[in-house]
Amino acid sequence: MKKLLSYILLALMVLGASAAFAGDKIVVAHRGASGYLPEHSLEAKSAAYFMGADYIEQDVVMTKDDKLVVLHDHFLDRVTDVMEKFPNRFRTVDGQKRWFAIDFTLAEIKSLEMTEGFKVKDGKKVQGFKARFPMGKSHFEVSTLEEELELIQGLNQSTGKNVGIYPEIKAPWFHRFEGKDISVAVLKTLKKYGYTKKSDNVYVQCFDPIETRRIKKELLPELGMDLKVVQLIAETSWLETMENKDGKLVPYNYDWMFEKGGMAKVAEYADGIGPWKPMLVKNESTADNLIITDMVKEAHENGMEVHPYTFRLDEGRIPSYAKDFEDMLDIFLNKVGVDGVFTDFPDRAVNFVRASK
């Protein structure tokens, strides 16, 4: 009898711990501590680590020589000096010159200086977020996925922490069009570094629903893996994902995800969703009248976590219905009930979550 009671108590403790973990709000460092240092630099990742982020994001694209690098766009010209160093290595897309990572070897990409993001206006580079780390200062470079995993795992060993990773497989449709299977390459790299099961501290995210389903239903089983998979959600008008129909690339239509029953369909192949904030709280909301959609409720009813993007405190990035950054966090974490947030300012989000416990 005593033995049985011991087993029951142990089981309750385990269940209690699991429930507590499941109820914890997580902070995902969006491109690292990108509000303070150039996005996706190893320096931004180190800063995010020591700010207490639960997970650190990696956007992953592929090079000409099949290496995986951490870069938000599948082109290089927004965050490096590629235009100056390789002026003729561009493609013209919709009348715009773009220097695609897939057209450069890793050695060539490593020769570039990475910087705070910018746009070119009237022939001049204009920093995207004026109050952030100054463009063109110090030295930063594009890192490989393996370099970043080794950094985070090394810090986990030296600090005794267990900070997770949150890789995004970028534009698999584009890589496939170029003859490369980026999803297999990313998953094999994760497996190499010991990320193989759901209990491991990793989420794999992707905007492409066709590919996300393939990852969950085909690739993970084939590789002997079982990871948490997150379906990112975009507006169809963003042209985030393209699909091949009758030999032509056409925009993928996300509209079904916003219909009643849409979350149940996503839950057939995903463990969570990553929606844009206005998909959860309408922009026309006011402080006295928050217009909250049913997406979080329906996702939770179907056993999925919800991690919206992107929480920023830059000028013009806090919606009018929130007083400040912390009020915005309170609305989403406590009133809407999301399970975590993607933010460029992980220190502020970590402090808020800790103070709320």
Across the structure, where does each feature detected by a protein language model lie?
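Bacterial N-terminal signal peptides
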Residues: 8-16
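Bacterial N-terminal signal peptides that target proteins for export
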Residues: 1-8
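Phosphate-group recognition and catalysis centered on beta-loop-alpha active-site segments
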Residues: 19-357
